[in-house]
Each structure stands twice: as C-alpha cells, then as structure tokens.
Amino acid sequence: MATELSLSVQYGVADARLPRWRLRRWVQYALAGAAGDGHAGLAGAELGLRLVGLAEGRRLNREFRGRDYATNVLTFEYGTGPDGVARGDIVVCVPVLAREAREQRKTLLDHAAHLTVHGTLHALGYDHIKAGEARRMEALETAVLARMGIADPYLAA
C-alpha cells in the first residue's frame, strides 16, 4: 500500500465502531486495489471522509444530485492533478449505512468497509453508470474486500 494518503475524517455523527484508523485502513486497501487495476501512476490521494446523519445526508443529496432523500454514500471527485494526486470528498450517511446493513444481513463494519471502498473508488474516477464500468468497479470492490476478509457484497444474503 505505497500510495501516499492524506485523509481528513470529520464526524457529523459519532460512531465508536468507525474510528479514524479503521476508515483510513479501508481507504488504503481501496488505493492499493486501484494501483493494481491500472492506477499504477497514482502518486497519492488527498481525501475528505465525513460521516453524517439523515438530515445532512438528505440535504447534500438534494443539493448536489437533486434527490430528496439521504443516500448511503456520496462522492465528490475533483480529479487527479498534474502531481498525480487524486482529490475528492466522500460522505457516508451512518443511519442509512446501518439500516442497509440490517436489511442485507451484513455486519455494520463489513457494509461500512464496502461503502468506504466504493466511495474511494469513485474519488479515483471509477463509476458504475455504464454496464462495463459497473462490472469493472464491482469486481474491484469485491477483490479489495476479499483482501480484507469480507464476502462479496453483491451476493444476496
């Protein structure tokens, strides 16, 4: 995991299960996975990661995506500069994350790891709008999570 990482973690809501060190570790795994998937020239990443509640999650989703509900993860990709450093912000709505984990019969930590990896990959330019892009991104997420000992998040529980 050689890619340099500057990660700013902000807590709009606190959750003792999601300390900075754990979030940082998940982001580092995602960066390592991306480096092995064609992002070898990535010199580093400067990312913000904010954990929010329902009201803030809903406001941000409405303001930036025109959708009036809180979503699980929002990513703002700012691109990779000439210095090879990718920049972006990731917002995880903790109540949505917790609800989805229960509904999907996953542990909160496994689902939080998945959403953190997913958001990090978006910050690096991955997307899932087109079918081919979605397959590539989901395969990479699955591989990264497997390295962490987490089951394929796309298999039905």
UniProtKB/Swiss-Prot annotation:
Pfam families: YbeY. GO terms for molecular function: metalloendopeptidase activity; RNA endonuclease activity; zinc ion binding. Keywords: Cytoplasm, Endonuclease, Hydrolase, Metal-binding, Nuclease, Ribosome biogenesis, rRNA processing, Zinc. Its EC number is 3.1.-.-. Its main location: cytoplasm. Binds 1 zinc ion. Coiled coil: none annotated. Its cofactor is Zn(2+). GO terms for cellular component: cytoplasm. Zn(2+) binds at residues 118, 122, 128. One of its GO terms (biological process) is rRNA processing. It is found in: Cytoplasm. Belongs to the endoribonuclease YbeY family. Single strand-specific metallo-endoribonuclease involved in late-stage 70S ribosome quality control and in maturation of the 3' terminus of the 16S rRNA. HAMAP family: Endoribonucl_YbeY. This is Endoribonuclease YbeY. The gene is ybeY.
